[in-house]
Amino acid sequence: LLSGKEPKPCVINLSLGSNLGAHDSTSVMNRFLAEEGKHAIICVAAGNEADRAVALKKTFDKAGETVKTFLTPMQTGELPSGKKTYYNLRNGQIAAYSNDSTEFEFQIVVTNTRRNNRAAVRIPVLTNSNGQATTYASGGDYSMTGAVINQTFAKAFDGYVSVASMKDPETGRYYAMAEIMTSDNQTTNKDGNYKLSLEIKSKEAGQRVDVYGDAQHIYFDDNKQEGFVSGTRNGSISDMACAANIITVGSYNVRNHWPSIDGFVYGYNKKGQEDDFPAGEASRFSSFGTLADGRNLPLVCAPGASVISSVNTYAVENPD
């Protein structure tokens, strides 16, 4: 037991987690936390990913129905990183879960917005791949064993996309994943007309698919294009925070301005702008979600934006 051989008061705070996962309390970590929550008070951070729509949930009315969304970069334009510069960087992982073991079709699509969002390249997982990945790459720095070096993909992006699927042994649910690392090709896609999108097609009426991004560099958006949908912030909750018998903790706003030991007052909002952090309200970045079992998380919120602390005796002024 986490509280030891002799039962004693025990509180454990976990300020960590990931937005990837089934979000249904059935994973090994979720089951472990639920069991230990019987013996200790376990507090888990909700997460700080709610600024963007990093989840997408769809219940299909019929078999063969499709939902489409754009994989939109969180930071558009140039992004210098070390010796490289990326353009409209899309980097991270996406996981899509069926509500049960029923399969669905999953595709990452290179979309040509100049041609009415016509598919230029499809990178599909049409049936269970049992974890075997299919990778498309631009070649050059992104050449890798087993990858399909696709010239149209390379015209759009420098980078790669890998897709795979399997039945999750922990949850019993069928799921598909994509790993993405793309930067717009500055010779043939400098205007950004080639974009990445996600397509999912159902196999049964009433089938539900829950899609989660890792909230690093990509979110789900319709880009104001017909036939595409935006994602939702509802579902940005950390997968670890979905366990039973725990206390899931979000953030609320305490102050939006604060004095510093340098004599100046700092704040989140600039003069003339709207108040993004109104005192007493849940912080916009604080993750949340409504789970399939009906629970709304987090359960409570604690001061998080911003936390005001006393000055400790070891504080010294930086001479620079």
Regions found by a protein language model. Name each.
Residues 1-320:
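Loop-rich non-cytosolic ectodomains and luminal regions
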